Amino acid sequence: MKMRKLFAGIAAAATLLGGMALGAASAQADGAATTAGSGTTVTGSAKFKFTAQDAKQLTNRELNAYKIADYVQYGTGNDATYGVQTAGTVTDQSGIKAALEAAVAGTNKTVPTDGGDLMAWALAEGVLDTTESSKDTATGAWKNGASRKFVETLKTRINMLGDPTVVDLGKNLAKDGLSATVTLPAGLYLFVDADYSAGTNKDATPSIAILVGSGNVENGVLNPLAEATVDIKNQTTAVTKKVNGKDAITASVGQKVTYTITSKVPQNTQYYSDYGYTYTDTPSVGQTVDFDSLKVTVADKALTKDTDYTVAKNEDGTFTVTISSIQKQTAGALITVTYAAKVTEAGASGSKAVTNAVVLSDNGAEATDSTTITNSGFSFTKTDAQGNPLAGATFTIRVPGVDGSFTATSDKTGTVTFKGLADGTYEVNETTVPNGFQQSLKAKFNVIIENGEVKFNGTDVWGLAPKESSDKYQVKNVKNVSQLPLTGAAGTTLFTVVALLVAGAGVAVALKSRQRVH
């Protein structure tokens, strides 16, 4: 009866942990065997296959394998059966005892103190079968069931388990990178990520500790040397950053933009004594961050600054947002960090583009994303009717999203330049005409910027701004109406003005004639 319960407990633990496949007997175990009480210890080797959803989970990944139990064969041939006993490499039984006490806490079981083998008792009594202590059997490896309590407690006492065997998963990858297979002596192992406390592997987070046994059970027969398969219990990290909802935008000087950073609360943070989760943001020159606007939400619920998260400005111009409450948040929930910034760079293109990168450090694993802001401008030349450059002409444009207007004045070469403009259509209005020129005749025209390319869109009503767009676009001032163009819309306007003047003169003469008659 005890033996049947032993294997039932082993099989249940195997189901729970996704890799501990043990059970009833087979006489097919090869390799040498040493005497263990009335049985012999199985010393043959077995393979352990670790699988992952993403190759990064296994890349550069090392695990420390602590053997905590041996298989023991009782009998020979077709009558052979198997049990377990604490591994001879364990140096201090009190570590396993403490782990078992954590596992049975709240149950009617008591860890024996009579000197018997603790691992044999644990599996015989079904201690690692969480169906007796937790209803969460489907995902027990990630939850706080009996087996997980056992593993998490034992992980803190690995100094009592003897020297581990280091297995390098990164050097034993399958061609697709989604599995890694290593060979170890048959038995039950606690696998602890070598990077667990340091958190320096940038490819993926450290794995939580895993309890895995070699072998499998088929038709009630145990083969302790069969390959065991287990999912690595870590995850890759991802982060997304947008500016105004996009990867790249154009924005004018003085325009406010909104940055949004998103990621998800990682799994299994509860199994770490300290879990680091930090965004390091690197805004380039050409923008001013509004730190008062920075907000953090998890699942659309606002977090409290200095309680749930902290913000630190660094001397190199970067700043960090640390989610200090990450272990209290719901796994898989969306984390959103938002803040505003004002664009200050008027020549944001090429090497001067305004960039903003974020690096998410998820307990050592890293992910990064970035955004880009560009802007451009346009120039034209102010001339007189003969094409000579004019200084002192002032023009203004209205810029969406920016208070006030942009103003530019022609220099001694007649050049007028507007910088730091987002893509869009701008109406250019002449507001100041140089002295000596007709003050009532002012130019007005449109400029279209698209993907940084500039197109001038004339002609204005006076013909001062030409219709054709070119790199040498010239806008004129005239001293009198006779210098206005005599063709096109401008010519029509001129003749209309002249006609009105003539008509006005005719009316005046007629009125004077009537006055003489009367």
Label the model's feature ranges.
Residues 2-518:
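Solvent-exposed loop/turn and edge beta-strand elements of beta-rich ligand-binding domains
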